[in-house]
Design a protein with these regions (language model features):
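ATP-grasp fold ATP-binding core
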Residues: 16-19, 100-102
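Short Gly/Ser/Thr- and Asp/Glu-enriched loop/turn motifs at secondary-structure junctions
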Residues: 12, 67-69, 102-108
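A short, charged, amphipathic alpha-helix used as a generic interaction element across diverse proteins
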Residues: 52-55
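Active-site-adjacent substructure of cysteine-protease-like catalytic cores
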Residues: 78-109
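Short linear proline/tyrosine/threonine-rich motifs used for host-factor recruitment
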Residues: 27-29
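Residue-level detector of short, conserved catalytic/binding motifs and their immediate flanks
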Residues: 13-15, 72, 98, 109, ...
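DNA replication initiation modules
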Residues: 7-9, 18-22, 32-46, 65-82, ...
Length: 198
């Protein structure tokens, strides 16, 4: 499977393995370093090049990369049914127009792109919006582990998504806005995105 992985991803230097483990009663993917311990997302020394991780592939359930620096990733969970993408997933794939692959579960997708000079406002936008099953990782000083399968949809390369990412964030990742206005000592007025309430 991984021999079909894009060369530009193979040239990336921050790979790790991952294994399924049960934590708090839930099955989760745990990143693993070739140094025989769990990979720490904040320590890029725990990651390695593609050829090295492939040399250890027998230890793991799969491989992944650290999203750090100018790398970006969009995860959409549970968006494939009967081999078709959901409307939201189709929209995002079309707009972002970058490398896209099917996740290990076979029911989700991941898009990999790059951003330059992008500021991810975590106070304004979710990183993980469970309402849509959507996660966005970009402009991170510390790594965020994501799985890589090589099971690509189409033949797109990893492209710069700096200009299109804000549109995705505005539509799907905005946190609720609630501004409290202090009008006097007796009454507080609340202004929300839907109107003014007393």
């Amino acid at each position: 499977m991984y021999e079909k992985l894009l060369q530009e991803l193979k040239d990336y230097t921050y790979f790790c393995g991952w294994k399924y483990e049960t934590r708090n009663g839930s099955r989760t993917k745990v990143p693993k370093s070739v140094k025989d311990h769990n990979a720490d997302n904040s320590n890029l020394d725990d990651f390695c090049g593609f050829s090295e991780i492939i040399g250890h592939i027998g230890k793991y359930d799969g491989i992944g990369i650290a999203i750090t620096g100018d790398m970006a990733a969009i995860d959409i969970d549970h968006c494939i049914e009967d081999g078709k993408l959901s409307d939201m997933a189709e929209e995002i794939v079309s707009k972002v127009n970058t490398y896209t692959e099917i996740s290990p579960s076979g029911t989700g997708i991941r898009l990999i792109g790059k951003t330059h000079g992008f500021n991810y406002d975590k106070e304004k936008y979710y990183i993980n919006n469970r309402k849509y099953g959507l996660e966005v990782y970009a402009a991170r000083d510390k790594g965020q582990f994501v799985t890589i399968t090589g099971n690509a949809i189409g033949d797109k390369h990893v492209r710069d998504i700096t200009d299109v990412l804000p549109e995705i964030l505005e539509k799907y990742m905005c946190r609720p806005v609630l501004v409290k206005l202090f009008c006097n000592t007796l009454f507080d007025k609340y202004l929300t995105v839907t109107g003014l309430h007393r």
